[in-house]
Amino acid sequence: NPQAKLISILSLLLGTTITISSNHWAMAWTGLEINTLAILPLISKPHHPRATEAATKYFLVQAAASTLLLFSCTTNALFTGQWDITQLTHPISCLLLTAAISTKLGLVPFHFWFPEVLQGSSLTTGLLLATAMKFPPITLLLLTSHSLNYTLLTIMAITSAALGGWAGLNQTQTRKILAFSSISHLGWMTIIIIYNHKLTLIAFYLYCMMTAAIFLTLKTTKTLKLSSMMTAWTKIPSLNAILMLALLSLAGLPPLTGFLPKWLIIQELTKQEMTTTATVIALLSLLGLFFYLRLAYCATITLPPNSANYMKQWQTNKSVNALTTTLITLTIMLLPLSPMIFSTF
């Protein structure tokens, strides 16, 4: 139903705008609730038991996180009389807010829902969940980061980077792999959030761009699991070859775009004399590199054992839309612009 889809998309835009532009906790909470209610029809749209299950899980987790957030800000208002987002000073409220926003984002140890929900959604809805739905909670985290416990945030960030890489190792479904990739990238964004807000936003924008390029490519080739990646090259060979580079960019390999945020974050952590933290999180990113390499290997180098099956999949003149090609180009070739990005700091 196009009307219902339009209402959902407009509600998503409205909810996100309300949250990121509000100073009052009640308005921020309202925006988050509008977002949650708007995405539910999109998750359950396929009318499949797995989609219904994903929508139910998403609703229960997000409702619990929103309740915790509301409890946090009312507790702060009770003790300090302040409803302003930047005036969150009570320690219990700060702890509750950290838990609430971490649940909204899918940071460890509140990550359990995210891979399951992404697996039950379509690729387009999965893209929204992995990118647009993270923007309002990231904004709230930026606005309140000066009040939050940095030791707790650092531990959560490092465990997110570790678990995001480790849990993705034995996955065969592309959506689950991208979900664990998202958890790992959130760890990188969270670890730098107190020291440099701009850097967190740059990392988030680049992550969204790279993830969008990969989701749209997988949607074009209709690839949902590793075994179908082996035959995807017959549909659009050139796109599949470029997908390998996009995956390696998401892994953070130079000279691709994904190397830029990791380079800047490690540089900033070193400036702040957190060399041990920088070393640990850099080593943990090697776990993620393994499954990105496995995806790239399946996409371009591996052939299925039965040659008769994949020859049937030849598709001639299948067009790739302009958005996908633009995003993939940026995902691969943005690193030369890094001096211009440095000048913004």
What are these regions (language model features)?
Residues N1-F345:
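Core, highly hydrophobic multi-pass alpha-helical transmembrane subunits of bioenergetic inner membranes
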